């Protein structure tokens, strides 16, 4: 490791390049999975062919389980449905910033960011604004790069997600994620 927190070379699990690449694959897969379940269609989002290694599959499955739990939170679904998407960029960045405003970073909040992005993509699909899908993914990855990258590196890369949610209490954490997202949406609605 050099002094910046990055591993020397570009291939390590905590390198900026690898974290962003894995994050893009996970976000793409998460959004395609959610869209396929909700809209019956899978948007064409392929940036590159996602890796088929066991680690990425485990991470994707972990995200899928959490997404399924969040889908069953009716209060959260109602609040997301009420979000005005006339200015989606402003909505996305305000909610994303509110999620991390207290300076506390954890995997639950990272997953909440992915979940919120997937819900905005589903709204774009429903309103037939497909060009917005790649834009939302870009915003999410920009936010990840600018605000979360160093924290993810400090957690050992994306593998930290598995240890965080790999415990039997992941359902409890899912409730926490829903709470963070609900609180962020509430703050945004009061300010907006």
From Swiss-Prot:
Residues annotated as signal peptide: none
Subunit structure: Homodimer. Forms higher oligomers under stress conditions. Forms heterooligomers with BAK. Interacts with BCL2L11. Interaction with BCL2L11 promotes BAX oligomerization and association with mitochondrial membranes, with subsequent release of cytochrome c. Forms heterodimers with BCL2. Forms heterodimers with BCL2L1 isoform Bcl-X(L), BCL2L2, MCL1 and A1. Interacts with SH3GLB1. Interacts with SFN and YWHAZ; the interaction occurs in the cytoplasm. Under stress conditions, JNK-mediated phosphorylation of SFN and YWHAZ, releases BAX to mitochondria.
Protein name in the entry: Apoptosis regulator BAX
Tissues where the protein occurs: Expressed in a wide variety of tissues.
InterPro entries cross-referenced by the UniProt entry: Bcl-2-like_sf, Bcl-2_BH1-3, Bcl-2_fam, Bcl2-like, Bcl2_BH1_motif_CS, Bcl2_BH2_motif_CS, Bcl2_BH3_motif_CS
Keyword Transmembrane attached: yes
N-acetylmethionine PTM sites in chain numbering: 1
Annotated gene: Bax
Gene Ontology biological-process annotations: apoptotic mitochondrial changes; apoptotic process; apoptotic process involved in blood vessel morphogenesis; apoptotic process involved in embryonic digit morphogenesis; apoptotic process involved in mammary gland involution; apoptotic signaling pathway; B cell apoptotic process; B cell homeostasis
A Pfam entry, by short name: Bcl-2
Record-listed cross-link Glycyl lysine isopeptide (Lys-Gly) (interchain with G-Cter in ubiquitin), residues: 128, 190
TM region(s), chain numbering: 172-192
Family listed: Belongs to the Bcl-2 family.
Keywords, ordered alphabetically: Acetylation, Apoptosis, Cytoplasm, Host-virus interaction, Isopeptide bond, Membrane, Mitochondrion, Mitochondrion outer membrane, Nucleus, Transmembrane, Transmembrane helix, Ubl conjugation
Free-text function comment from the UniProt entry: Accelerates programmed cell death by binding to, and antagonizing the apoptosis repressor BCL2 or its adenovirus homolog E1B 19k protein. Under stress conditions, undergoes a conformation change that causes translocation to the mitochondrion membrane, leading to the release of cytochrome c that then triggers apoptosis. Promotes activation of CASP3, and thereby apoptosis. BAX deficiency leads to lymphoid hyperplasia and male sterility, because of the cessation of sperm production.
């Amino acid at each position: 490791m050099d002094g910046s927190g990055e591993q020397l070379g570009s291939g390590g699990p905590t390198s900026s390049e690898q974290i962003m690449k894995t994050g893009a694959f996970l976000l793409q897969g998460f959004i395609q999975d959610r869209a396929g379940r909700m809209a019956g269609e899978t948007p064409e989002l392929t940036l590159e062919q996602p890796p088929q290694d066991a680690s990425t599959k485990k991470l994707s499955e972990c995200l899928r389980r959490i997404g399924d739990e969040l889908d069953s939170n009716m209060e959260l679904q109602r609040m997301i449905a009420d979000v005005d998407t006339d200015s989606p960029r402003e909505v996305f960045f305000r909610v994303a910033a509110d999620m991390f405003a207290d300076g506390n970073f954890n995997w639950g909040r990272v997953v909440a960011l992915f979940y919120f992005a997937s819900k905005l993509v589903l709204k774009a699909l429903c309103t037939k604004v497909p060009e917005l899908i790649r834009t939302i993914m870009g915003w999410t990855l920009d936010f990840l790069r600018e605000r979360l990258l160093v924290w993810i590196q400090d957690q050992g890369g994306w593998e930290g997600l598995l240890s965080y949610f790999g415990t039997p209490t992941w359902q409890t954490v899912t409730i926490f994620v829903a709470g963070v997202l609900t609180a962020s949406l509430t703050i945004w609605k009061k300010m907006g």
